[in-house]
Amino acid sequence: MRRRLQHVLICGLWLAMLAVRAPAMPAAEARIAVAANFAGPMQRLVPLFESATGHRLLVAVGSTGALHAQIRHGAPFDVFLAGDTTTPAMLRAAGVGVEGYSFTYATGRLVLWSGDPRLVDGEWRRLAIANPALAPYGKAAIETLGHLGLIEQVRSRLVQGENIAQTLQFVASGNAQLGFVALSQVMQDGRMTAGSMWRVPREWHAAIAQDALLLQRGRDNPAAVAFLEFLRGARAREVMQRFGYEFPAEGS
């Protein structure tokens, strides 16, 4: 009887040691396509997510329209963080996105910005906007100019960026004195980083609601699914809020 108990104990200890030594499930890797306006917050979110989960994220930034085209042509992305709601809806309709895995992660704000603290109300020669066919913030800029009845008046002085990041660069470099950009590009930690700006009234253009979408390639990717859950959480929202983003009401 004693030998039998001893044998059971030894077997139990051996199994326990195997359990302790068993390697943890390997971390996964996800590729995230990110609209250019969200590049700043994403730089903050990636290390927070990776530290919390052990997963790894690879990020590609571009205009919503350009990323949409890449995804439709088979680019290997698992998650799409768009600058609008229309583009993710088109991907879902085309069967590229996963039904039930899409939500509005933030609402952006359009601002008129100058690198010169004195120039928002001063003289200017060039006005930069993002390509309205590719960038939701460019579309909002055109809607704003239309609301003011200024499209024809300023048309000859417009310079157009491929995306909102290039639009900001036009203004920051002095190639344009003013530009319609995303608030998130010129605000960090609740403060304007440089220059001067004017927040465009929300009612002057369609709301810039921004949807996240799980793509078919990421359906069974634990890192992709975990990142979308992380994006809904309080920690991620705190980061986004510091860049000027707003959020839809609960249940909307």
List the model feature ranges, each with a label:
Residues 8-20:
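Bacterial N-terminal signal peptides
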Residues 25-73, 81-85, 89-252:
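Exported/periplasmic ABC-transporter solute-binding proteins
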Residues 1-3:
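N-terminal secretory signal peptides that target proteins for export/translocation
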